[in-house]
Every structure is written in C-alpha cells, then in structure tokens.
C-alpha cells in the first residue's frame, strides 16, 4: 500500500470517527436540554445561559485555534521524524495555554459579580463561579486533542466529547433535580448544580485524554540523539501565528 493511499485512508477514517462522535454528542445534547429546561424553569435556565455567555467569550480567548494549530505543527514534525520536536510542542503548548486558561478561569471566578451585573442577572454570579474552572480544563483538553489529531488519531477526541456529553447529562441533570425537587432550593442553585455537571464533564474528558496520551507514549518511536528541537520561543510564536487568526474569526 502506497504512503499516499495510507494517508488518504487515515484521513477518511478519522473523518468518519469524528462525524460519528458528533452525531452521538448531538443526540445526547438534545436529550439533555429538554428535561433541563423543565427542571430549571425559565428563570433558572436564564441564569444557566447567562453564565455560558461569559464562559464562551473567555473560552474563545483561551482555546480557539489551539487544536488546529497543534495538529498542524505535530503533523509536520512527525512527518519529518522529529520526535523531540513533537514532545516539545506539546509541553510548551500545555504550559502556555494552560496558564492562559487558568488566568481566564480566575477572571471569570473573581469577576462573576461584575459580569452578572452587566447582564442584569445577579443570580447568575454563582453559576459563573461554578463554571469558571471549566475554562482552564478546556484549555488543557484542547492541547491534548490537538496533539492526538496531529498523529491523525481522531478516536480520543471523539471519545472525550462523548464523555463530556454523558457526564453533563447524568451529573448535571441529577444535581439540578436534587437541588430543586428534593431540597427545594431556588432555581439559580439548581442552575449552578447543572453547571457543576459541565465542570465535572470537562474534568472527566481531560483525565481520559491525559490517560490516552500516557498510554500512547509507550508506542512512540525513540527520538534520534542528534535531533535538536526548536526553541520554546519559536514554537510558541509559530503556534500563536496559526491560532490567533482562527481565534479572531471564531
């Protein structure tokens, strides 16, 4: 089998895995939304949505473009058999984007009252605080996904997305139902419970991706002793030049 045919088969196989994962996630998301709205009511769901509006902005700043940039850089380094380079790309990206994600999480957590006030929904502040750790978790998750995709391995990304959706469904709905229907808490507390399910889902997906990364490291070729990877500064510059245009258009 020629190398071109192998690449083509890998591409279409990866695309099929991603497509299947997206379909499963969409089905789970549809099942999730209907009972969530019923449990939270219009007021609680408004708090839930307000928290996600801020979350999505910070998520765009901290993660948009990372998987694509990482995938391209890892793929190019791997094609040239620069295995030290692939490891360094991963380490530099995880450190930098992880730090950016943690910063954005802190902004969301400590700025929750400010953001909620701007949106005229002060009750949403609690939801924002519960959701804040997810920004950092998704930043790390994006780096792991980009690394796997750089090796044309789409399975971990698809599995992690399904894990996210399932944990969000099970943990989120359970906590929202328990707080409102069993404990009789206000709607915004139920919304915070549902959002806790999101944070747990991101943590579960990140743990899976970290496990998959460690598992696959045992099968990666040993780098050549003479190989000299690029400097961290150059790697970061290249990654940002690839990621920033995607972030701007996201």
Across the structure, where does each feature detected by a protein language model lie?
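Helix-terminus/linker motif at the lipid-water interface of multi-pass membrane proteins
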Residues: 27-45, 116-117, 185-187, 247-250
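Membrane-interface junctions at transmembrane-helix termini in multi-pass inner-membrane proteins
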Residues: 139-161
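N-terminal membrane topogenesis motif
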Residues: 1-28, 84, 88, 230-246
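Membrane-interface helix-loop junctions in multi-pass transport and translocation proteins
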Residues: 155, 166-212
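Small-residue-rich midsections of specific transmembrane alpha-helices
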Residues: 49-74, 133-136
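Alpha-helical transmembrane segments of multi-pass membrane proteins
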Residues: 121-144
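Short membrane-interface helical motifs at transmembrane helix boundaries
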Residues: 103-122, 181
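Interfacial/gating helices of multi-pass transporter permease domains
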Residues: 36-57, 187, 191-192, 234-242
């Amino acid at each position: 089998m020629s190398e071109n045919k192998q690449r083509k088969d890998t591409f279409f196989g990866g695309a099929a895995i991603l497509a299947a994962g997206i379909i499963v996630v969409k089905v789970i998301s549809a099942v999730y939304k209907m009972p969530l709205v019923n449990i939270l009511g219009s007021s609680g769901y408004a708090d839930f949505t307000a928290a996600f509006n801020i979350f999505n902005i910070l998520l765009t700043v901290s993660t948009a473009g990372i998987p694509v940039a990482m995938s391209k850089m890892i793929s190019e380094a791997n094609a040239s058999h620069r295995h030290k380079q692939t490891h360094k790309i991963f380490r530099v990206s995880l450190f930098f984007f992880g730090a950016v994600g943690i910063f954005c999480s802190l902004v969301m957590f400590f700025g929750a009252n400010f953001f909620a006030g701007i949106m005229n929904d002060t009750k949403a502040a609690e939801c924002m605080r519960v959701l804040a750790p997810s920004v950092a978790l998704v930043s790390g998750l994006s780096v792991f996904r980009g690394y796997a995709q750089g090796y044309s391995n789409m399975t971990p990304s698809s599995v992690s997305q399904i894990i996210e959706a399932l944990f969000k469904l099970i943990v989120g709905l359970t906590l929202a139902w328990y707080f409102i229907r069993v404990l009789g808490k206000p709607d915004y507390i139920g919304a915070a419970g549902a959002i806790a399910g999101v944070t747990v889902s991101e943590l579960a997906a990140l743990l899976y991706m970290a496990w998959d990364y460690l598992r696959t490291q045992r099968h990666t070729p040993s780098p050549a002793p003479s190989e000299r990877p690029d400097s961290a500064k150059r790697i970061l510059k290249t990654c940002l030049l690839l990621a920033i245009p995607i972030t701007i258009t996201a």
